[in-house]
Amino acid sequence: MKTEVLPYTPLMKTIWPQRTLSRDLLLILVGSLFVALTAQIALPLPFTPVPITGQTLGVLLVGAALGSRLGFLALLAYLLEGAMGLPVFAGGTGGIAKILGPTGGFLLAFPLAAGLVGLLVERFGLDRGFFGTLLAMLLGNALLYLVGLPWLAAWLMG
């Protein structure tokens, strides 16, 4: 397979540098399962239908650890698992209705946020220190809000 030349390498490419299809598929599956597990850490809020969950941290960590391409694909797999009805979303829920509901914008932004954090790691090495990691995570979180909040507002108004 073709090798990528990146200024920095994400954690998984350092730990497991040999790139094969089976490795990539396994990392995508593990990444999606990690986010599914972190989604079960949920704190419902009385004033909004969107709970605070651990899955946001999971999304950002998957992006940082797997890189832009595998991070994006892992979160795309996560959305497909949930759309098929597997109980991977917050509160052990799944289904297309969840994606079309108030949390849908946040869910749809997950692959983008993981891809962005992975890109920041690959291009600028922002996972090499505390402040770089903080910046990458804040930018990924900002992207989640940029997509998720307008969706939530439209859902609440409509």
For each predicted feature, which ranges?
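Short helix-perturbing small/polar motifs within transmembrane alpha-helices
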Residues: 2-17, 23, 37, 96-144
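Interfacial aromatic-anchored transmembrane helix boundaries in multi-pass membrane proteins
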Residues: 40-51, 79-113
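Interfacial helix-loop-helix junctions of multi-pass membrane proteins
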Residues: 86-92, 150-158
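Hydrophobic transmembrane alpha-helices
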Residues: 2-72
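Residue-level recognition of pore/gate-forming positions within transmembrane alpha-helices
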Residues: 32-35, 78-82, 114, 141
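Membrane-water interface at transmembrane helix exits
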Residues: 39, 43, 81, 117, ...
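Hydrophobic alpha-helical transmembrane segments
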Residues: 25-30, 57-61, 71-77, 103, ...
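Strongly charged, low-complexity linkers/loops
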Residues: 132-133, 144-156
